[in-house]
Amino acid sequence: MSKVLVFTTSTCSWCRRAKRYFKERRVPFKEVNIERNPDAAREIVRKTGQPGVPVIKIGSRWIVGFDREKIDKELARKAL
């Protein structure tokens, strides 16, 4: 299983930026579109309290929104 999950919707511009950010840095990730996966949508609300996307999970850490500083910190912690 991928260490990085990016929860998205098809119309989310910040989700596209997050995916591009990981691709540019050659960080493998798995995209989970919550429009097609209602269980994943419920999971992010349960874990983060937020219904919006992007939500990024790196290892066991959840990041709400496209926050480069938090993403870089977690990627460094995981040596990705």
Please annotate each region the language model reported.
Residues 27-40:
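Thiol-based oxidoreductase modules, predominantly thioredoxin-like and allied folds used
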